[in-house]
Amino acid sequence: MSARQEFASHHATFNHVWSSLLLEELFRLGVRDIALASGSRSAPLTMAAAAHPGFRRHLHFDERGLGFMALGLAKGSGRPVAVIMTSGTAVANLWPAVAEAQLTGVPLIILSADRPPELIDNGANQAIDQQGIFGRYPVYQQNLPSPTATIPAAFVLSSVDQALAQQARTPGPVHFNCMYPEPLYPGDAYLDFSAYLAPLGDWLRSSEPWSPWQLTQAPCPCQPDWDELQGKRGLIVAGRIQDPVQAKAVAALAERLGWPLLADLQSQLRFDGRNLVHADLALQHSGFVAELARAEVLLQFGARLISKRLGQFIKQQPWQAYWLIDPQPARLDPDYRLRRRLLCDPAAFAAAHPVAHPHLPWHRLAERQQAVSQQVRSACERFSELGVCHRLNQLIRGQLFVGNSMPARLMDMLGEAGKGPSRVMTNRGASGIDGLIATAYGFAQSVQPGSNEPTTLLLGDLSALHDLNSLALLGKSSRPLVVILLNNDGGSIFRMLPVPTQDALLETYYCLPHGLHFEHAAAMFGLHYRTPASLADFERDYTTALEKGVTLIEIKVPSSEVAEDLKALGSAIRGS
């Protein structure tokens, strides 16, 4: 809202006054995107969102997908995204997205409509107890009472200011539960609320928030033992870092220190030439492990590593010092090995900890990795899940969103140094296989307006079945979007785990083969469809799909192939 456009004084009901106040204050605090699902109890919020000229509105018919779409938007833009839905189980459907947002520090703002208190727990339709429905996961939650003239308008504005200030300090989801009595829709005439709004004074004509909280960013202090630490044999591990600019500071620090860099897929450094690109697989090679174990200290930037082998190596080493640098105020220490936790951005840490002069590398890990890299290339020469993921790592252009289970692991293991994607995003907080299509769509829409940058989603068949109705979102994409679907007919990751195989236990209760293909799903939702039969076909189909529209590329492979290929590759590495 511009400074010249005064806040409206005429509204249908008090419900609409409060909804307009709430959304206007969110806008003044920087919110620009709102995700909405249809519903009657949420009509005041929906009408306020539709009337506001400053919001981008994103619609979906399924609240579970809606929450994940908002999650992707917030992850991609780095800005809070509001989500509006009606009462009842519609709210409960947001639980998975709220959990992921809390675990990864993503700023969602949940605006749930609710029945008034007198219609809760008395048999009224579509009414459940929504207060505290998300448990301890919101970083701020408030049950807004039914709108009334006895509660000042400044209460609504001040509540929003407090919530977003808390969210800025501790990134994660915020929940406002809005208890609206009927009427929910406008009558024949709007009412004049000038007297009620008058105490807001200049706010009505301003573009500034009511009472913004002034947050100060404490500088990252230089650690007193830094000079001693940088003289040791060190290792730098890069975990989840969402900002490529922050990630570059980590790579530059590793290079100047002469320390090896092991970069997770989520670090934005996976394709950097300074990264030991096949370190996960090389941890099966005794010579590589012995050389890496000479490291005395560990600096880790970002948490939630995909590689289990790397996590086990870190857990087993007798580190003289182990520091984790991550701005998220959470205990990111699953093995209780950390000895120092620094709450700051990687670039702030690097700026506060200068390296006096470049150090020569203390290790020969690149040399040790060469044989492993050759084994990887040989294993990826044919059409398979390994081959497709290895080739995708070389062809990728634009943004990349990677699903959980096998896709994340394969993309983290394979590939080569090169240009790589502009950004990599995952849902590795709760690491669920639900909502991945919707999250990727939201991530794709976070690209700067006017850009035609493509987004690629890689996921498995069970993940696709979990979120099949979110394919309806993809047809709305204004930019190229490619879905690469690895269809191995079930949960083949369980073939990598020690599940007993007798009495068909593995197949019947874990892998859950379904025998389904996705050609008709693509047709139903108006998507282009390709099913390559060779790596050359895949390269042709993928590069074409990057240019325009939305394309689903289904990779049909035998169910047991990926497990067999990885076991064979591991044996070859251990024997090399």
From Swiss-Prot:
On the tree of life, the source organism's domain of life is Bacteria
Species this chain originates from: Aeromonas hydrophila subsp. hydrophila (strain ATCC 7966 / DSM 30187 / BCRC 13018 / CCUG 14551 / JCM 1027 / KCTC 2358 / NCIMB 9240 / NCTC 8049)
Sample GO molecular function, one term: magnesium ion binding
Question: What is this enzyme's EC?
Answer: 2.2.1.9
According to its UniProt record, this protein's enzyme class is transferase
Q: What is this protein called?
A: 2-succinyl-5-enolpyruvyl-6-hydroxy-3-cyclohexene-1-carboxylate synthase
Q: What keywords are annotated for this sequence in UniProt?
A: Magnesium, Manganese, Menaquinone biosynthesis, Metal-binding, Thiamine pyrophosphate, Transferase
Gene3D superfamilies recorded for this chain? 3.40.50.970, TPP-binding domain
Q: How is the cofactor bound?
A: Binds 1 thiamine pyrophosphate per subunit.
Family designation: Belongs to the TPP enzyme family. MenD subfamily.
Self-association state and partner proteins as the record states? Homodimer.
